[in-house]
Amino acid sequence: MRDAGAITIIDLDWRPVLWADPAAAPERYRAAMGHASADVWTRAEVEIAVGEHEPEAAAAVLLALGPRLAVVKLGGEGVLVATEDGAEVVPPIRVEVVNGLGAGDAFGGALCHRLLAGDDPAAAVRFANAAGAHVVARLACADAMPTEAEVLELLGAAGAR
């Protein structure tokens, strides 16, 4: 599908208790990564998947496996976005954290939304980062999922458009 131009994204949620043999995860992750056009990971997940702790090195390994976009979420340090043209860290949007539940879901959905809209990877990640920030600043994760207007407002307030 990726080779036909479809956008396919792997955004795994590492839960070792769900694996009969957690040691098998890296091999299975690597097999799947080669089929996606974008890989999205947290720093901890990417280290499990490719054996690299440093985000830039991990992104290089991811890109070598085939995806055109590697995203490594760095928590309070922002998000690394990497393509064959280079890498940059999109800074975090500072909000008061109320509840972290749902932030990854908001990030993933917003990233898909903006990539499908044709945004360049860094712009899509900035938008996704703001969507995640919007959710963590609220109590109920499902009710906190932002509209596009709310994300754009937060980006504008942060000076991050």
Features from the language model and the residues they span:
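Conserved beta-alpha-beta core of the PfkB/ribokinase-like small-molecule kinase fold
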Residues: 1-60, 77-79
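Conserved phosphate-binding/catalytic region of the ribokinase-like
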Residues: 3, 51-161
